[in-house]
């Protein structure tokens, strides 16, 4: 029985309209040998038999053990999280424009804001952004609006910022008259050389962007850079992995006065890895800048009868109130991801988050230490890291990654495209999901690959 409602004449008309000769041509990017003409299912089998057959076939698929990080991380997601998120009240609900329309949804966002403000040490949080990269771009725009003392629209950025974040930042700000200066990183420790900051002392900056842990996994000298920025009248934008804040000091404690705005990618907290997302960005700030913060903000209030309720607050910033000057941007997808993150943080609690972060660091430390024992392999930088580290290899890193795939391991992120000096370097990441057996298999596979191709 065909479940396609179109007649042959209708299909032909549609194909003629788009200039295709057949339906198969629409799928020509899939190699012919990979296409299945039939599912090869026997006639007359029942649902149980069909399910068992499909399960048996699915079990033939093999998933490599993943040691890639670079901004998106494999963490364990308790089954309860997406079981709750998938409930219709959350899963099919639309982003609330009227506070009274969805008190439960608003409370979830309020709880998210409370937890993110606590995690980052800031006074206020919004309801999320599209992803970490756009959260940074919006943070830069926010800082420029907020810093009335700055005479320019220049922003100083440490070179070890995630390259994708930088590209998104440049794209969003391209026609807004904003200029960027880059501080080169120290090749010995993989982070910004604070002594080089004085080279920029005579330039007026509206903001300084610090990522820690940075793209190369290293912990930046956040105190020195923060104090320098404030001394020269710039606001400090912290870009960070929220999971790291469970064991590292919060951006509110950076330097003498703390960062002014904090942003980053929220994916590590309950959101599964996916090509293209949806993920969500987070943004928190000091109260002095809250009226320039983009995105929705949920507040707690009381109604006429004195009953506690939740509402969208500071709505004059939003698109449905002042479209021409709106700072708001969020969509329903991000609201759903925020729900997952809220449940994730609630289930794990402060102790659970700390345990996840600690085990992730310990596993990465173990992996790096064991790799460095292999002849010709070494840890690239001599400074502290969180859950990913750059490893130098005696062979081309891209070749190494390809060969490790044959051993069932996604070995890490090839850095040659990021920097020409790192053609023989990969960035490896371990989290709480990696077992001692996984790490042992990585080490043995590395020895095998290097022996096979002459490393």
From Swiss-Prot:
This protein's record includes keyword Oxidoreductase: yes
Enzyme Commission number(s): 1.4.4.2
Keyword line: Oxidoreductase
Pfam families associated with the record: GDC-P
Highest taxon listed in the record's lineage: Bacteria
Catalytic activity: N(6)-[(R)-lipoyl]-L-lysyl-[glycine-cleavage complex H protein] + glycine + H(+) = N(6)-[(R)-S(8)-aminomethyldihydrolipoyl]-L-lysyl-[glycine-cleavage complex H protein] + CO2
Annotated SUPFAM superfamilies: PLP-dependent transferases (SSF53383)
Family annotation (InterPro entries): GcvPA (IPR023010), GDC-P_N (IPR049315), GDC_P (IPR020581), PyrdxlP-dep_Trfase (IPR015424), PyrdxlP-dep_Trfase_major (IPR015421), PyrdxlP-dep_Trfase_small (IPR015422)
Gene Ontology MF terms in the entry: glycine dehydrogenase (decarboxylating) activity
Enzyme class: oxidoreductase
Example GO biological process: nucleoside metabolic process
HAMAP family membership: GcvPA (MF_00712)
Family recorded in the similarity comment: Belongs to the GcvP family. N-terminal subunit subfamily.
Subunit and partners: The glycine cleavage system is composed of four proteins: P, T, L and H. In this organism, the P 'protein' is a heterodimer of two subunits.
Function statement: The glycine cleavage system catalyzes the degradation of glycine. The P protein binds the alpha-amino group of glycine through its pyridoxal phosphate cofactor; CO(2) is released and the remaining methylamine moiety is then transferred to the lipoamide cofactor of the H protein.
Name the record gives this protein: Probable glycine dehydrogenase (decarboxylating) subunit 1
Source organism: Francisella tularensis subsp. novicida (strain U112)
């Amino acid at each position: 029985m065909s479940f396609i409602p179109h007649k042959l004449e209708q299909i032909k008309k549609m194909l003629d309209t788009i200039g295709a000769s057949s339906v198969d041509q629409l799928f020509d990017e899939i190699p012919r040998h990979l296409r299945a003409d039939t599912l090869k299912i026997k006639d007359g089998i029942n649902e149980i038999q069909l399910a068992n057959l499909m399960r048996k076939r699915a079990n033939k698929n093999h998933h490599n053990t993943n040691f890639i990080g670079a901004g998106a991380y494999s963490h364990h997601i308790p089954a309860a999280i997406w079981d709750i998120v998938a409930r219709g009240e959350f899963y099919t609900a639309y982003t609330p424009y009227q506070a009274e329309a969805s008190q439960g949804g608003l409370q979830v966002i309020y709880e998210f804001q409370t937890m993110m403000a606590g995690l980052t040490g800031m006074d206020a949080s919004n309801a999320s952004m599209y992803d970490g990269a756009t959260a940074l771009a919006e943070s830069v725009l926010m800082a420029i609006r907020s810093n009335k003392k700055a005479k320019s629209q220049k922003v100083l950025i440490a070179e070890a910022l995630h390259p994708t974040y930088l590209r998104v930042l440049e794209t969003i700000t391209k026609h807004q008259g904003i200029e960027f200066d880059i501080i080169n990183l120290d090749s010995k420790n993989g982070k910004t050389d604070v002594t080089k900051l004085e080279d920029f002392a005579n330039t007026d900056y509206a903001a300084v962007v610090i990522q820690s842990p940075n793209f190369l996994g290293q912990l930046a000298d956040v105190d020195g850079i923060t104090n320098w920025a404030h001394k020269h009248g710039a606001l400090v934008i912290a870009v960070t992995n929220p999971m790291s804040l469970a064991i590292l000091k919060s951006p509110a404690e950076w330097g003498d006065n703390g960062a002014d705005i904090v942003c980053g990618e929220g994916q590590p907290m309950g959101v599964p890895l996916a090509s293209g997302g949806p993920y969500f960005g987070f943004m928190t700030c000091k109260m002095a800048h809250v009226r320039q913060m983009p995105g929705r903000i949920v507040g707690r209030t009381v109604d006429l009868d004195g009953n506690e309720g939740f509402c969208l607050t500071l709505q004059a910033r939003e698109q449905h109130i002042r479209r021409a000057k709106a700072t708001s941007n969020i969509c329903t997808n991000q609201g759903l991801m925020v729900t997952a993150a809220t449940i994730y943080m609630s289930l794990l609690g402060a102790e659970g988050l700390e345990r996840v972060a600690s085990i992730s660091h310990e596993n990465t430390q173990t992996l790096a230490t064991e790799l460095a024992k292999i002849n010709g392999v070494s840890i690239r930088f001599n400074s502290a890291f969180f859950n990913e580290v750059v490893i130098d290899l005696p062979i081309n890193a891209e070749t190494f990654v390809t060969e490790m795939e044959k051993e069932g391991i996604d070995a890490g992120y090839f850095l040659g495209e990021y920097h020409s000096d790192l053609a023989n370097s990969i960035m490896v990441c371990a989290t709480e999901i990696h077992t001692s057996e996984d790490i042992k298999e990585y080490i043995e596979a590395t020895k095998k690959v290097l022996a096979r191709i002459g490393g």
